[in-house]
């Protein structure tokens, strides 16, 4: 008999008491030697059924283990075999099969990073199970296992995971990524865009230095306008002004964009810089 614990719609379910009875009967009648494997198996069984009892679970349905990733521990990984991201474990007379990809997703989503660390401790590459694990970790702000992966210089299939880091203002982790990996200029540019859109002035200050304003003034002006239009963060706007950009550029385009997008804090700041813009504001609101 197989008990398939996956999220693909094809799983069976079983009554908890029935499953416990089956396992106990098999152990009593067919298991003669109390080996290390048998001891670990019994520990797994005891932990699973203790969890079911604690949470008043009477029927084991699809995904019960994958959806509760704390159940995937060292013993389960030691005794099971992994093939194409699926963990299979024989607990006679049943075989439990767990979708580790779903387990990783739920582990990250619900801030239970223990599973990722266990996989790494067991030299099991989580990237082979979930190729987007870096992005998952950065999106859900699970930085401890992410930093561990970066320090290991783990395989990275796509550096899009740095963009949530920029949006969240995690400059130190971005710098760590750049220490271990070579990021293309295009990626750096997108990091800056995310920082500008989300008001992360610490990241803007790090990448858009005085030298950047001297060597690429048109690009800096583009960032300035985009920041007003799509971000609207006053701290970002002030940074660009402090670096030498002015509101009179391109026939007062910064003022017009701020007026059209109703950036009141920015307009107030611009008015403090130049109170002659009042008519421009009126014409563009």
Swiss-Prot record:
ANK repeats lie at residues 99-129, 157-186, 188-214, 215-249. Transmembrane segments: none annotated. It comes from the Viruses. SUPFAM superfamilies: Ankyrin repeat. InterPro entries: Ankyrin_rpt-contain_sf. Keywords: ANK repeat, Repeat. This is Putative ankyrin repeat protein R551. It comes from Acanthamoeba polyphaga mimivirus (APMV).
């Amino acid at each position: 008999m197989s008990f398939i614990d996956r999220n693909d719609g094809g799983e069976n379910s079983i009554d908890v008491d029935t499953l416990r009875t089956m396992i106990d009967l098999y152990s009593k009648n067919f298991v003669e030697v109390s080996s290390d494997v048998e001891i670990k198996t019994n520990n797994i069984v005891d932990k699973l059924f203790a969890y079911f009892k604690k949470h008043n679970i009477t029927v084991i349905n699809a995904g019960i283990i994958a959806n509760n990733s704390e159940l995937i521990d060292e013993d389960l990984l030691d005794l099971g075999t992994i093939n194409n991201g699926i963990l299979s474990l024989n607990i006679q007379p049943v075989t439990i099969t767990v979708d580790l990809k779903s387990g990783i997703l739920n582990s990250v989503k619900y801030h239970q990073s223990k599973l990722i660390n266990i996989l790494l401790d067991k030299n099991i590459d989580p990237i082979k199970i979930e190729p987007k694990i870096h992005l998952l970790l950065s999106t859900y702000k699970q930085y401890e296992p992410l930093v561990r992966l970066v320090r290991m210089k783990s395989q990275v299939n796509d550096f899009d995971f740095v963009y949530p880091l920029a949006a969240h203002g995690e400059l130190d982790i971005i710098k760590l990524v750049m220490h271990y990996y070579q990021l293309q200029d295009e990626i750096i540019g997108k990091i800056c865009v995310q920082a500008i859109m989300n008001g992360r002035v610490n990241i803007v200050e790090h990448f858009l230095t005085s030298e950047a304003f001297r060597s690429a003034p048109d690009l800096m002006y583009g960032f300035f306008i985009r920041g007003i239009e799509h971000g609207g963060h006053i701290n970002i706007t002030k940074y660009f002004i402090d670096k030498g950009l002015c509101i009179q550029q391109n026939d007062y385009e910064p003022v017009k964009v701020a007026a059209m997008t109703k950036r009141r804090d920015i307009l107030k700041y611009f008015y403090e810089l130049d109170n002659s813009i009042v008519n421009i504001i009126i014409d563009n609101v």
